[in-house]
């Protein structure tokens, strides 16, 4: 383990926790995240732009140049080029560092910030980056009563947030041993998600589960054309591919769709904080099942997803959907009350011939009857299911349910499905269970190599699955180890006989003593 890296990460996490602790009670956790993450993003793009400009000027011999000290008028000459190259423009006077200096004495700080955020978004209008910046600061409500009942109190709170974010050691680490901004984001999301319970789980897939899904989806590959998430939340799962493969190995970038506007904004912020250029991500704010985006895109070689469990959708109330090429091959739609398999069919439709999809699924879809059974039959009969993995319970924020992973492929070399029982692959950490690196490695290697291990994994021919009435539950195929104590009947009978003999001897001695007493 890299001790320096862990030490830096711990320092960063302690500092973030201190900000949250300082503001506790004024803005409740899950609402507060928008402010901290939003200001962290504002600081990041300010420093990113400044460093980019300074680096160019210093390389040209202008070693004393510092963009933050430039006048707005002088900087204006570079606006067009910067928008083309970086996707946005910030005047020197509106950079995070300069706003921070003036903030304690700015009686109209809320209005100043509102104007700055509007200017940043407007700088991208008409440019290729417009969609990536539009509405990005909408969730940072600088006039919210949650910050305080008066303008003075709200501004005091804003100064605290700005100083807290400004004090974070995000750019001073040598050798970039940690992805500081990105790591801070992930820590904050995890912290708030765990405290927010069920609502937090909608935004954030735990890092270990993200790691597992991603490694399954890219196993055997050193690069992919792009990565896609059907319900991308805050983007943490999408970005795991950048960590696992390296962001340059995701050649065309990161794609996703998210129905919740707040989460959609968080996802775009997350992309920027992980240093993903505006032209390397495409996140859409639409209903994936009813209004899918990326129709015309080249199919995806890696799909990872943790869609919402058993949500309602239009289903057969919408006559158009049964003819939708994503769903029509199965001949039936997922039930209106349970959209899980609609997300699976959507992912399969978007998947490249040489691609892999890894999707977290609610366990009920593996065995329920009706339309869901017909969709399972379609998937099995067409050999699209590569593996089903039973996960431990209590891995996710807000639910203790033991979920599964369904792995899809379109070009399998054999007509069989691998079943893995990973329900015992975890350690307990506070209120949740957690996958260790060893657990993840065991699952990924078993899945990729398709190895059979007693009580853990089994390769099942698809016709055997058909004989089981298309039940996909792991427990149907992977035998449970009998952990009950083995009893030796012969030995037990001998012990009983010995006890009876001792009892008879004692009775005889007691009778003898009683006779002597009565004597």
Question: What kind of feature is each model-predicted range?
Answer:
Residues 34, 197, 229-231, 252, ...:
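Short glycine- and Lys/Arg-enriched binding-loop motifs that mark or flank ligand-binding interfaces
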Residues 2-3, 7, 297-519:
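A conserved structural/catalytic subdomain of Rossmann-like adenosyl-cofactor enzymes
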């Amino acid at each position: 383990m890299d001790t320096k890296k862990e030490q830096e990460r711990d320092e960063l996490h302690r500092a973030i926790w201190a900000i949250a602790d300082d503001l506790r009670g004024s803005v409740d956790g899950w609402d507060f995240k928008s402010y901290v993450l939003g200001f962290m993003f504002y600081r990041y793009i300010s420093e990113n732009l400044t460093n980019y400009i300074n680096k160019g000027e210093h390389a040209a011999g202008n070693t004393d140049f510092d963009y933050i000290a430039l006048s707005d008028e002088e900087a204006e000459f570079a606006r067009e080029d910067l928008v083309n190259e970086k996707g946005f423009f910030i005047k020197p006077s509106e950079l995070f560092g300069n706003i921070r200096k003036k903030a304690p004495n700015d009686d109209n700080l809320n209005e100043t910030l509102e104007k700055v955020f509007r200017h940043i978004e407007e700088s991208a209008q008409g440019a290729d980056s417009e969609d990536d910046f539009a509405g990005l600061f909408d969730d940072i409500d600088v006039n919210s009563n949650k910050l305080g009942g008066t303008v003075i109190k709200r501004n005091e709170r804003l100064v605290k947030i700005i100083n807290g974010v400004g004090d974070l050691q995000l750019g001073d680490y040598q050798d970039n041993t940690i992805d500081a901004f990105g790591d801070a984001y992930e820590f904050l999301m995890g912290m708030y998600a765990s405290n927010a319970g069920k609502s937090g789980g909608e935004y954030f897939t735990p890092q270990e589960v993200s790691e597992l899904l991603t490694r399954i989806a890219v196993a055997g590959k050193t690069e992919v054309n792009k990565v896609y998430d059907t319900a991308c939340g805050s983007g943490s799962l999408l970005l795991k591919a950048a960590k696992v493969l390296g962001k340059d190995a995701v050649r065309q970038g990161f794609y996703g769709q998210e129905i919740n506007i707040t989460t959609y904004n968080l996802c775009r912020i997350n992309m920027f904080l992980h240093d993903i250029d505006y032209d390397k991500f495409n996140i859409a704010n639409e209903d994936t099942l009813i209004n899918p985006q990326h129709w015309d895109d080249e199919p995806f070689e890696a799909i990872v997803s943790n869609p919402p469990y058993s949500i309602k959708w239009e289903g057969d109330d919408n006559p158009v959907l049964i003819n939708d090429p994503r769903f029509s091959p199965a001949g039936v739609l997922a039930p209106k009350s349970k959209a899980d398999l609609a997300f699976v069919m959507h992912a399969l439709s978007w998947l490249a011939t040489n691609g892999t999809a890894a999707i977290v699924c609610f366990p009920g879809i593996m065995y329920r009857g009706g339309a869901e059974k017909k969709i399972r039959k379609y998937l099995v009969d067409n050999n699209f299911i590569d593996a089903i993995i039973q996960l431990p319970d209590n891995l996710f924020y807000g639910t203790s349910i033991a979920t599964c992973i369904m792995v899809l492929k379109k070009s399998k070399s054999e007509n069989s499905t691998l079943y893995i029982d990973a329900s015992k692959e975890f350690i307990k950490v506070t209120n949740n269970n957690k996958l260790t690196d060893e657990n993840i490695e065991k699952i990924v290697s078993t899945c990729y190599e398709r190895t059979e291990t007693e009580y853990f994994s089994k390769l099942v021919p698809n016709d055997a699955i058909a004989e089981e009435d298309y039940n996909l539950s792991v427990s149907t195929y992977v035998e449970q180890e009998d952990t009950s104590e083995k009893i030796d009947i012969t030995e037990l009978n001998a012990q009983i006989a010995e006890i009876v003999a001792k009892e008879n001897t004692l009775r005889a001695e007691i009778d003898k003593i009683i006779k002597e007493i009565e004597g």
